[in-house]
Amino acid sequence: MTHASLEATTHRSDGTARIELRGDIDGSAGGALGAAYGETAGADSVLLDFGAVDYINSTGIALIVGILARARADARPVAARGLSEHYREIFEITRLSDFMTILADEQSPPRDEEGEPE
């Protein structure tokens, strides 16, 4: 199975920095994920958008824990959206959901054709 390298793009809106994640979150994703979080400096909150993530392994979970730790140190709440049912369950089992708000798809703001919030 071929895995797609993670692409992480940061967008800002109304005090929230949204990190749009695309591809696989595994050991190779550390640089992209860390750099994207670095771009959230000054935001009131962080939204991790998993809508285009295909795969997360245990190392990827550890990288997400690292982002949660950085956000906690920065006193910024983190939310996640776009998780498949499978990864929603994984986040509950690993207790990641205890440290971030998991948004249902209905709670996600509507997007335009480019994927930006309307």
Residue ranges and their predicted role:
Residues 1-55, 66-118:
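STAS-like cytosolic regulatory interaction modules
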